[in-house]
Design a protein with these regions (language model features):
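Active-site beta->alpha loop and helix N-cap motifs at the rims of alpha/beta catalytic domains
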Residues: 74-205, 381-389, 393-470, 504-547
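N-terminal amphipathic alpha-helix/helix-capping segment at the start of soluble metabolic enzymes
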Residues: 2-50, 169, 310-314, 338-390, ...
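Structural preference for beta-strand elements that scaffold enzyme active sites
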Residues: 45-49, 76-78, 103-107, 126-128, ...
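Conserved, mostly hydrophobic/aromatic
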Residues: 48, 109, 177, 220, ...
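Catalytic alpha/beta core domains of metabolic enzymes, predominantly
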Residues: 145-157, 189-317, 335-352, 358, ...
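Short, acidic/polar
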Residues: 57-67, 114-117, 267-271, 395, ...
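Intrinsically disordered, low-complexity terminal tails and inter-domain linkers enriched
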Residues: 6-12, 311-341, 465-508
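Glycine-rich phosphate-binding active-site loops on the catalytic face of alpha/beta enzymes
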Residues: 75, 126-140, 279-291, 596-609, ...
Length: 727
């Protein structure tokens, strides 16, 4: 096979390596491709899609579900075609939809069966193929290849894959080359490992084969259930494509995200991070729910960034000479103005201190439970709460029991509360940090567990007074930082009037912890050099696309070897709880996924405190920076599913949701499990009607277990490993 690439000379590398600009939001300019009557990429809006969960052979049910999906906001609808029978029935589904007046482009989802893909490509507007299982194998074998043998394997795949490419070219059918982290072939795994690089190379092999056939009507995806892996893979894909003169549109999605708020937050972390990078031309949010509930979530995420484009932020060309668009033209580059005010700090290319392709937490020196190797803390703003009633703290994870005069702490107990200038009329739980404005803190008679937060101006004044011998109120160097854990075990008790005593927890001039609130877009540069070793920064931004500002600030700290801990703060005016959670997950998740942030603070005065607290812990869980509950990796269901995924997921959750830190995969069929659940500790996978196979990691423990006894046998496996806890 001779590989050729589009003509046009050497491509221009993106300023941000994987995105047009690290300082401002602007979209990566992709080639426009045609999917039926509805093009994707180029200057088109972000397209929304989902996938049916009906049996593809049930024409009427599939048509009616497709119509519901269209009405919920889907631009495209994907339907599974696991065999020739289902592929052939796509014609009947399409005919019925057209007769009812629905011209929605249909996408055939193919795994394992090239003949079904070739049939579907003649019938529908687009086919999705998985390079990990289209012509390769997955047996979890470690294979060794010489360079000659590896090339021979590529030649074999080329011969098996190119008939589909030729059919797509003949019929005007688009193709998605969709890599899944969990279904990388043994060949790729053996050569590149279970890595984002392996995911990228798996797709690039197929892209090059398509280009060898002069077929360019492609879009690409890099899906994983692990948000860190997913984000890294997409970024690496774009950088790799640009180096080879490619700019294919991207299909974004976090696979097996789960259900409910957890699934939405996890999807928003992964998809939102990439949208903030300017990447993404179509979105599918994978929830273990009916597919019509997915499109509104995807639409809400896309809308946050499309508003930015309407306000003047455009797209930038990926290369000086991009491959021609679908109509043969080359789109012109747009120089976006950006929405946010310019930060005093800008990034010129990817700095040496920061890699967007691997997770490395920013190095900080711990102050009490903040920073270092400790999990990020959660800070809640409770100024607007009823500070005469201790019961409101249940929303923050502290349940007050009047008869016992005690607090019981849940696994979602926040670490700090921001009081501002407000004073409570009751004793807060021992160990719960209280943060007051500096002027209010100075007047407190009892400063136990109470810490000041300074404005930039106040801090510089105090530091100057301290250095001049004026005796700053709080900033005298401490003899040592206090230590106590960032998270509390469920069921722990605290008396509201008899707090646990920790060494040195009185905030006096001889102790350390204090906070300095800084605006990422406007702060005195001299402030950073004045920071005391016991200071913690609260970094906020009012910019719509504040991720770029906050990231630039933290990279600046890295470059100047300033290892001060930092809490990320964002303000939200929304009154819609669902939109708030999605926005916060996208904004904070993007930074936490890159290793930035030692805590988070979400200020949302119109959102219930319990929602803010749950979202905060959910974001940390989704970014895998702080685990506070059981994690479920459950697929969104499709026509291949062998049991009711929604019902089964809820049933398993009800029995296991107290197993903090355990990851359980629930997979409807063998396509994504066991591969996609390789990140899980345990797996529950449908392998036949009424039959379940149970896994410990990648290892099959029990095959073909009858469904009624499968959960109890899974619990037995967890118990054997010493990981079971009675409720």
């Amino acid at each position: 096979m001779t590989q050729t690439f589009p003509e046009g000379g050497s491509p221009q590398v993106l300023a941000g390596g994987y995105c047009p600009d690290l300082n401002h939001y602007s979209r990566f300019l992709t080639r426009e491709i045609q999917i039926g009557h509805l093009p994707m990429g180029g200057s088109n809006p972000i397209r929304i899609q989902s996938m049916t969960t009906t049996d593809t052979m049930d024409t009427l049910a599939t048509v009616e579900q497709t119509i519901r999906m269209v009405h919920s906001g889907c631009d495209y609808v994907r339907i599974t075609a696991p065999s020739m029978r289902e592929a052939e029935n796509l014609a009947a589904i399409k005919k019925e939809l057209r007769q009812r007046g629905y011209a929605v482009p249909l996408i055939a989802d193919i795994h394992f069966t090239p003949n079904a893909a070739e049939m579907a490509a003649r019938l529908v507007e687009k086919v999705r193929v998985n390079p990990g299982n289209y012509a390769d194998k997955k047996r979890f074998e470690n294979l060794e290849y010489t360079a000659t043998a590896y090339q021979a394997e590529l030649e074999r795949i080329y011969k098996k894959f190119t008939p589909l490419v030729k059919i797509c070219k003949e019929y005007g059918t688009a193709m998605r080359i969709g890599t899944n982290h969990g279904s990388l072939s043994d060949r790729i795994m053996s050569h590149y490992g279970d890595t984002p690089r392996g995911m990228v190379e798996s797709a690039m092999e197929f892209i090059r084969m398509c280009e060898d056939q002069q077929f360019y009507n492609l879009c690409i995806s890099m899906k994983a259930s692990n948000t860190q892996v997913m984000v890294q893979a997409y970024r690496l894909l774009v950088e790799t494509m640009v180096k080879e003169g490619m700019n294919y549109p991207l299909h974004l999605g976090v696979t097996e995200a789960g259900d409910g708020e957890d699934g939405r937050i996890k999807s928003a972390v992964g998809i939102g991070t990439l949208l903030a990078d300017g990447l993404g031309d179509t979105i599918r949010v994978s929830l273990t729910e009916d597919p019509e509930f997915e499109a509104p979530v995807a639409r809400a995420l896309a809308a946050r960034y499309e508003k930015g484009e309407a306000a003047g932020v455009g797209r930038r060309a990926a290369a000086a000479n991009n491959p021609a668009a679908a109509d043969g033209s080359t789109p012109a580059a747009v120089n976006p103005s950006g929405l946010a005010a310019d930060s005093p700090i800008t990034l010129k290319g990817i700095p040496a201190t920061y890699s967007p392709y691997t997770y490395t937490r920013r190095i900080t020196q711990p102050v009490q439970q903040i920073g270092g190797h400790q999990p990020p803390v959660v800070m809640l703003d409770i100024q607007a709460q009823n500070l005469k009633d201790p019961y409101f703290l249940a929303a923050a994870g502290y349940q007050y029991h009047a008869l016992l005069d005690k607090y019981t702490l849940s696994d979602l107990a926040c670490d700090f509360v921001y009081m501002g200038e407000q004073l409570p009329s009751f004793a807060l739980p021992g160990g719960l940090g209280q943060i007051y404005r500096y002027t209010t803190w100075r007047g407190l008679a009892n400063k136990q567990y109470c810490y000041p937060v300074y404005s930039a101006a106040e801090y510089l004044t105090e530091r100057t007074a301290d250095e001049n011998g004026g005796g700053g109120e709080h900033l005298t160097p401490a003899g040592g930082a206090e230590q106590h854990p960032a998270a509390y075990a469920g069921g722990a008790e605290q008396h509201p009037g008899e707090a646990t005593q920790y060494p040195g927890t009185h905030a006096t001039p001889q102790t350390g912890l204090h906070f300095v609130e800084i605006d990422a877009a406007d702060f005195p540069q001299a402030l950073l050099q004045q920071l005391h070793p016991s200071a913690v920064i609260i970094l906020h931004t009012a910019a719509q696309f504040g991720i770029q500002q906050q990231r630039a600030f933290m990279v600046h700290l890295q470059e100047n070897k300033l290892e001060v801990p930092l809490i990320l703060k964002r303000n939200y005016s929304e009154s819609d709880a669902a939109l708030f959670s999605l926005g916060a997950a996208a904004d904070l998740g993007a930074l936490l996924t890159d290793g930035f942030g030692d805590g988070i603070c979400l200020d949302a005065p119109h959102i219930p405190l319990q929602t803010i607290n749950a979202s905060s812990f959910g974001i940390l869980q989704a970014t895998r920076t702080r685990i506070s509950k059981t994690e479920y990796i459950s697929c969104p269901s499709c026509g291949r599913t062998l049991f009711d995924l929604q019902e089964t997921t809820q049933y398993i959750r009800a029995k296991t949701d107290h197993l903090k830190g355990i990851k359980i995969a629930i997979m409807g069929c063998i396509v994504n499990g066991p591969g996609e659940m390789a990140d899980a500790d345990y797996g529950y996978v449908g392998t036949g009607p009424g039959k379940i196979t149970l896994y410990r990691g990648k290892e099959v423990v029990k095959k073909n277990v009858d469904t009624p006894s499968a959960l109890s046998e899974l619990i037995d496996i967890i118990r054997e490993d010493g990981n079971w806890i009675e409720k």
